[in-house]
């Protein structure tokens, strides 16, 4: 499912954000590209829930939390998000790429993936997808895009 999400993001969302979505056409295009229908449907459902979260239609608790509150991860969240991923989320909060509401959307969408454990690169993609359509997060999206596609051209001395 995650490969489908990245393909969708790179092909449709990121390159053509104003495009009207014809879910049947996208499903057919993805099937023609070699993705399994189950993965396609799971990815489209994942994106639909993300859109609902971004519009505030689901999980209204996201908007009532104290921004200064410390996030305590559940056991299951710790299993999925190793120390490096949790540290990266904290880093994103500290540099103000993520606010508490976006952080909770990221964690919600991570937990909805069908992967037992998420690596740092996958987390970066999820953060980018979450930030993509949240009004007011345009600068955060650009910062995250730079972090995702950052290439270290420096030399070690």
From Swiss-Prot:
Family designation: Belongs to the Smg family.
Name recorded for this polypeptide: Protein Smg
Tree of life domain: Bacteria
PANTHER family named in the record: PROTEIN SMG
Matches recorded under InterPro entries: Smg (IPR007456)
């Amino acid at each position: 499912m995650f490969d489908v999400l990245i393909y969708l993001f790179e092909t449709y969302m990121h390159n053509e954000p104003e495009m009207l979505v014809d879910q049947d056409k996208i499903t057919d295009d993805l099937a023609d590209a070699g993705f399994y229908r189950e993965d396609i449907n799971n990815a489209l459902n994942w994106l639909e829930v993300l859109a609902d979260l971004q519009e505030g239609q689901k999980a209204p608790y996201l908007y009532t939390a104290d921004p200064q509150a410390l996030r305590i991860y559940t056991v299951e969240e710790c299993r999925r998000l190793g120390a490096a991923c949790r540290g990266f989320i904290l880093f994103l909060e500290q540099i103000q790429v993520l606010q508490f509401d976006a952080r909770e959307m990221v964690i919600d969408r991570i937990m909805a993936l069908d992967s037992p454990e998420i690596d740092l690169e996958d987390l970066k993609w999820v953060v980018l997808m979450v930030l993509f359509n949240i009004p007011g997060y345009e600068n955060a999206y650009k910062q995250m895009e730079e972090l995702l596609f950052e290439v270290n051209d420096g030399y070690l001395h």
